[in-house]
Amino acid sequence: MTTVITRLYADEKTACDIARQLKSEGIPKRALKVVVADGKKGAALAEALKSAGVHPSAAAGYAERVAGGLPLVAKVNYKPLGAAKLVRAITARARWSRSRTQPKSSPVRTHLK
């Protein structure tokens, strides 16, 4: 089963640094995607998130938050063994972006697809 783990970061550099660290730990590059707003709003941003693997029912909610940060999306399965746990551990070390509903130290919930 694939697990989609999403995290919001305050800036693109932080999100890309985390993606590089995950890649160096064995997470395949194809499983990592940093989605940037790049002027996209609403439905276009939700579509970008869906194409990155975010479940359609969650994409609209995340699209609203992308304006305040950049989500790192990691689609992981059982290879390498313990990949989901590794992604959670590495992303937990970084600072999350502020949002209206989440404290800075709290991750956005993981969604299964």
From Swiss-Prot:
UniProt function note: Seems to be required for the LH-II stabilization.
Keyword annotations for this protein, in alphabetical order, are: Antenna complex
Q: What is this protein called?
A: Protein PucD
Question: Origin organism of this chain?
Answer: Rhodobacter capsulatus (Rhodopseudomonas capsulata)
GO CC, any one term: light-harvesting complex
